[in-house]
């Protein structure tokens, strides 16, 4: 015993060795119990049966872990309604669309997978592949075009059946589908838009190329400057872990107002794992009877399934094709010559041509963008934007370190 009644150094070391030994014995017992539980009951020896009886707490813990793993696995599985069931559900959804006084659509990455832009949590999603240690790739994002779902939403808005669209997507495809900017809230930004935050109000620059080449988490300067004040421009992307503060294109004010007025919400292609964290979108302060009716289209489980009036297990394009048929509405075909981005875009100034190396959009696939001598139809390695690729790289690095 050391002076003053405390333990001596050798006594502390001995106590630490005893603690570590007990922990190792507990881990070994846990491994033994786990191996026994993997066997069928008829295959267990009498000694193994006694060990399980003496380790009720460990058995309970391991069985609980197994149930949780199975539950998570089931939630990640994609489920498809059979064709007849899906048609029945779409008829019900069509009735809800017709009778809605204020319908708001929430969209996620699942509506853009048909444009070869991967989602995040599907079987071939970004996070899913990274968790498995597999590489992530995507087609050049400048080649993506609005999907059948994007064009259907635009037609529904034209017909005043949809009042507002709230999107998590950064791909700019809602804007390019012809949806008015006042009708969109791009909560996580738009890869084609950079802004000057020194100008009041903020000055926006819509481009025909991905502006996020040099940007990443907490690094948003694009390398170009404002035509009016000369301040460095920044992208509009809200990365995971960031809080969006820009007025546009996030348009939170309109999203909140639309949600407060909504009597019906249609969620398309979103896991809702991020959107559920935005309480302003769900009117949870209202009594249950006054909350909007929720309709969800997704192949996987979502945390809002229990709140939904109807869950449709199907691909967004398939569901929207059936819905538009049921409503008797023709789906417009996307035409690059009519893409609004070309009339909204601000051209680069002299000397800015080398400020990016991304392929620019052009009205025709045969037409090479100014300064672009490459063959637009030639195959090229996939290019990931800063909003997309940098996040993938960070996740992969964390996975490798772990």
Curated annotation (Swiss-Prot):
* Cofactor notes: Binds 1 zinc ion per subunit.
Q: What is its main location?
A: nucleus
Catalytic function, reaction form: N(6)-acetyl-L-lysyl-[protein] + NAD(+) + H2O = 2''-O-acetyl-ADP-D-ribose + nicotinamide + L-lysyl-[protein]; N(6)-glutaryl-L-lysyl-[protein] + NAD(+) + H2O = 2''-O-glutaryl-ADP-D-ribose + nicotinamide + L-lysyl-[protein]; N(6)-succinyl-L-lysyl-[protein] + NAD(+) + H2O = 2''-O-succinyl-ADP-D-ribose + nicotinamide + L-lysyl-[protein]; N(6)-propanoyl-L-lysyl-[protein] + NAD(+) + H2O = 3''-O-propanoyl-ADP-D-ribose + nicotinamide + L-lysyl-[protein]
Deletion phenotype, per the entry, is: Mice show a reduction in lifespan and develop heart hypertrophy. The mean and maximum lifespan is reduced by 59% and 55%. Mice develop kyphosis and lose subcutaneous fat early in life; they also show a general decrease in stress-resistance mechanisms. Mice suffer from degenerative heart hypertrophy and inflammatory cardiomyopathy. Hearts are also characterized by an extensive fibrosis.
Location comes to:
Nucleus, Nucleolus; Nucleus, Nucleoplasm; Chromosome; Cytoplasm
Asymmetric dimethylarginine PTM positions read: 390
Q: Where does Zn(2+) bind?
A: 196, 199, 226, 229
> Which residues are reported to carry the modification Omega-N-methylarginine?
390
Q: What class of enzyme is it?
A: transferase
Q: List UniProt keywords, sorted A-Z.
A: Chromatin regulator, Chromosome, Cytoplasm, DNA damage, DNA repair, Metal-binding, Methylation, NAD, Nucleus, Phosphoprotein, Repressor, Transcription, Transcription regulation, Transferase, Ubl conjugation, Zinc
Basic residues: which segments have biased composition? 392-402
In terms of SUPFAM superfamilies, this protein maps to: DHS-like NAD/FAD-binding domain (SSF52467)
For the ligand (NAD(+)), the binding residues are 108-127, 168-171, 269-271, 298-300, 316
Domain (Deacetylase sirtuin-type): residue spans on this chain: 83-330
Instruction: Please provide the Gene Ontology terms (biological process) for this protein.
Output: DNA repair; DNA repair-dependent chromatin remodeling; homologous chromosome pairing at meiosis; negative regulation of gene expression, epigenetic; negative regulation of phosphatidylinositol 3-kinase/protein kinase B signal transduction; negative regulation of protein ubiquitination; negative regulation of transcription by RNA polymerase II; osteoblast differentiation
| Catalytic site positions | 188
Instruction: Please describe the organ and tissue distribution of this protein's expression.
Output: Detected in liver, spleen and testis. Detected in embryos.
Instruction: Explain the post-translational modification.
Output: Phosphorylated during mitosis. Methylation at Arg-390 by PRMT6 inhibits the H3K18Ac histone deacetylase activity, promoting mitochondria biogenesis and maintaining mitochondria respiration.
* UniProt biased composition (Basic and acidic residues): 9-23
Q: What terms describe the molecular function in GO for this protein?
A: chromatin binding; histone H3K18 deacetylase activity, NAD-dependent; metal ion binding; NAD+ binding; NAD-dependent protein lysine deacetylase activity; NAD-dependent protein-lysine depropionylase activity; protein methyltransferase activity; protein-glutaryllysine deglutarylase activity
| Activity regulation (UniProt) | NAD-dependent protein-lysine deacetylase and deacylase activities are activated by nucleic acids. Histone deacetylase activity is activated by DNA. Protein-lysine deacylase activity is activated by RNA. H3K18Ac histone deacetylase activity is inhibited by methylation at Arg-390. H3K18Ac histone deacetylase activity is inhibited by deubiquitination by USP7.
On subunit structure and binding partners, the annotation says: Interacts with UBTF and the RNA polymerase I complex. Interacts with components of the B-WICH complex, such as MYBBP1A, SMARCA5/SNF2H and BAZ1B/WSTF. Interacts with ELK4, leading to stabilization at target promoters for H3K18Ac deacetylation. Interacts with histone H2A and/or histone H2B. Interacts with DNMT1. Interacts with SIRT1.
Q: Which family does it belong to?
A: Belongs to the sirtuin family. Class IV subfamily.
Q: What protein is this chain from? A: NAD-dependent protein deacetylase sirtuin-7
Per the UniProt entry, what species is this protein from, by scientific name?
Mus musculus
């Amino acid at each position: 015993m050391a002076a003053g009644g405390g333990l001596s150094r050798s006594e502390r070391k001995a106590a630490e060795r005893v603690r570590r030994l007990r922990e190792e014995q507990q881990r070994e017992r846990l491994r033994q119990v786990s191996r026994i539980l993997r066997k069928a009951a008829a295959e267990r020896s009498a000694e193994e049966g006694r060990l399980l009886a003496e380790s009720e707490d460990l058995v309970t813990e391991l069985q609980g872990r197994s149930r949780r793993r199975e539950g998570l696995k089931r939630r990640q599985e994609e489920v498809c309604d059979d064709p007849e069931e899906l048609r029945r559900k779409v008829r019900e959804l069509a009735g809800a669309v017709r009778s809605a006084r204020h319908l708001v659509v929430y969209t996620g990455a699942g509506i853009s997978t048909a444009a070869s832009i991967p989602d995040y949590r599907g079987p071939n999603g970004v996070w899913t592949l990274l968790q498995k240690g597999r590489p992530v790739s995507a087609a050049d994002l400048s080649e993506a075009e609005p999907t059948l779902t994007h064009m259907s939403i635009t037609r529904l808005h034209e017909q005043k059946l949809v009042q507002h669209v709230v999107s998590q997507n950064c791909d700019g495809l809602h804007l390019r589908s012809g949806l008015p900017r006042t009708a969109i809230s791009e909560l996580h930004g738009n890869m084609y838009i950079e802004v000057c935050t020194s100008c009041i109000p903020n000055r926006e620059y819509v481009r025909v190329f991905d502006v996020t080449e040099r940007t990443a988490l907490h690094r948003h300067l694009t390398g170009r400057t404002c035509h009016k004040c000369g301040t460095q421009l920044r992208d509009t992307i809200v990365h995971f872990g960031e809080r969006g503060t820009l007025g546009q294109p996030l348009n939170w004010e309109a999203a909140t107002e639309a949600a407060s007025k909504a009597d019906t919400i249609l969620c398309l292609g979103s896991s809702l794992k991020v959107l559920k964290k935005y309480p302003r979108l769900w009117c949870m302060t209202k009594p249950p009877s006054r909350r909007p009716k929720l309709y969800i289209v997704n192949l996987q489980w979502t945390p809002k399934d229990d709140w939904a009036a109807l869950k449709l297990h199907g691909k967004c394009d398939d569901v929207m094709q059936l819905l538009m048929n049921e409503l008797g509405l023709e789906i417009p075909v996307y035409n690059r010559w009519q893409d609004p981005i070309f009339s909204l875009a601000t051209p680069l100034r002299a000397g800015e041509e080398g400020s990016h190396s991304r392929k620019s959009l052009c009205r025709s696939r045969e037409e090479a963008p100014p300064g672009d001598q490459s063959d637009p139809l030639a195959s090229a390695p996939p290019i990931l934007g800063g909003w997309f690729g940098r996040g993938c790289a960070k996740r992969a690095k964390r996975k490798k370190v772990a």
